[in-house]
Amino acid sequence: MVDKHEEITLPIVLSCNYQSDITYPGQKQFDCGNPVIDKFVRASLKKSVRNSDCAAKALIDRQSGELIGICTFTAYSLEKQRVSGVLQGSQPSEIGVVRLVMLGVARKYQKRGFGQDLLCDFFEHVKIIHRALPIKGVYLDADPAAINFYTRLGFVQLSARPNVFGALPMFLAIQHILAA
């Protein structure tokens, strides 16, 4: 019989820059429940980071070294019409942003706040980027199942219609990130 009051022991995790020269335990079996993210993490992440196609933050179990979560991002630009009504004042025709490409936490670690922890670390990285090269915010294409998660973090939908892959474009202005 299981004691309902038994404490669940959460792993002690380390959020760090993903290193393409390391083989992380669990990476080849990574399963966050999203087939696109799973396939990318298992087969393409290492090469994409090595080739500077993206940067990545990793969430690692300190004890086992297991890859718990991943967040990939890259420089990007949006046409100002895409963010009309979201940004104040006059804007150039193209605005610089950081694009959050993929965010995934292994299923067995989901619903424990690790995705939010990984995003908070990502936002700290975005602040550093902004100090070196000012940007207007963070852009992402949200899987429909993740829209509420991103909305709770302050992201707004840029379109009511999903793209051809079923994802909705969302945006978080840099002011919100800097204020956090």
Residue ranges and their predicted role:
Residues 1-112, 117-139, 143, 147-180:
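Non-catalytic substrate-recognition and accessory regions of acyl/acetyltransferase enzymes
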